[in-house]
């Protein structure tokens, strides 16, 4: 009986230790170049260079649409509001309105 008990305790201990151990597998990257599988195609030579992106030319009739949540706050004195109020209102109507822009 004591031999069976000792064997069962050893078995449980080995099972518990196996849960704590991480398994590691060596992939093809660990192999030397002579042992690597040759299933891959060699890299293509003479690839075309990526052309530099062109800078877009902005024309007068181009329209840019943008919709994003944002917060806009402006602090003006009464004199500044008298001077810039109509222009500011026109800018806000153009930004927040659905009609085409008017300048």
From Swiss-Prot:
Keyword Ligase listed: no
Modified residues (Methionine amide): 45
Lipid-linked residues (O-decanoyl serine): 29
Superkingdom of source: Eukaryota
Secreted as UniProt keyword: yes
Entry keywords, A to Z: Amidation, Cleavage on pair of basic residues, Hormone, Lipoprotein, Secreted, Signal
Annotated region (Disordered), positions in chain: 27-51
A biological process from GO: G protein-coupled receptor signaling pathway
Signal peptide: 1-26
Tissues and organs where the protein is expressed, per its UniProt entry: Expressed in the telencephalon, hypothalamus, pituitary, intestine, liver, spleen and gill, with expression strongest in the intestine.
Name of this chain's protein: Ghrelin
Native species: Carassius auratus (Goldfish)
Taxonomic classification: Eukaryota, Metazoa, Chordata, Craniata, Vertebrata
